[in-house]
Amino acid sequence: MGHKVNPVGMRLQINRTWDSRWYADTKDYGDLLLEDIKIREFIKEECKQAGVARVIIERPHKKCRVTIHTARPGVIIGKKGADIEVLRKKIASMTDSELHLNIVEVRKPELDAQLVGESIAQQLERRVSFRRAMKRAVQNAMRMGALGIRVNVAGRLGGAEIARTEWYREGRVPLHTLRADIDYAHSEASTPYGIIGIKVWIFKGEIMEHDPQARDRKAQELQDGPAPRGAGGNRRGDR
């Protein structure tokens, strides 16, 4: 079963949580959900060159907090913050709530499945060999500390008449293990021969805590390093 379902959805409420974090009454739910979709699609199109990995939307009371995880924050922020102000105004016009926009840097894009998939897609659109693009992505991920990675590409590879699927894997990718921290994403490359689909699974280790926020905390530690410990071995802020 682990090979049939989305690894992200399968692990929700076990060791990871949703990218949309809010509650609404039945009468407002549809409108807010549509608003989320429009905001995500707009950011994906507007910040295409910035390498957007995730967009997290939270809605505390009468507010809308949008957090963009990106590999190139400077592209979004712009010179002296000019570009981010333009982006903030455009997103604010799409919602009636008070908008708060945050930018978070992804310091290891080689370990983010979405960014890896988009990188492969861009290479395929530039007519780079699909085998070379896949192998480069796998080698970079393993070099940066991944315990395993699998990449699938499907379509008219190399302009072939008949579509086929090719995959490349290195290390372990235990899809059946629910405590496994597996990042998954899919992308598409638009080529002269048609659309090529790309799927990426990256295994980063195991999360022993049964906590939806555990994966986010682990990702933050990988970015910033473990929090300093005080006397008694406790991390500062744990008390």
Swiss-Prot record:
UniProt lists compositionally biased (Basic and acidic residues) regions at 212-221
Q: Which Pfam families match?
A: KH_2, Ribosomal_S3_C
- GO MF, one annotated term: mRNA binding
Gene3D superfamilies referenced in this protein's UniProt entry, alphabetically: 3.30.300.20, Ribosomal protein S3, C-terminal domain (3.30.1140.32)
Q: Where is the KH type-2 domain?
A: 39-107
User: Which PROSITE patterns does the UniProt entry name for this protein?
Assistant: KH_TYPE_2, RIBOSOMAL_S3
State the Gene Ontology BP annotations: translation
Which keywords, in A-to-Z order, does the entry hold?
Answer: Ribonucleoprotein, Ribosomal protein, RNA-binding, rRNA-binding
Q: Where is the composition biased (Gly residues)?
A: 230-239
Which Gene Ontology CC terms are recorded?
Answer: cytosolic small ribosomal subunit
Q: Which domain of life is it from?
A: Bacteria
UniProt keyword annotation of ATP-binding present: no
Q: How does it associate, per the subunit comment?
A: Part of the 30S ribosomal subunit. Forms a tight complex with proteins S10 and S14.
Q: What job does this protein perform?
A: Binds the lower part of the 30S subunit head. Binds mRNA in the 70S ribosome, positioning it for translation.
Q: Which family does it belong to?
A: Belongs to the universal ribosomal protein uS3 family.
- Listed name of the protein: Small ribosomal subunit protein uS3
Identify the species of origin: Ruegeria sp. (strain TM1040) (Silicibacter sp.)
Q: What gene is it encoded by? A: rpsC
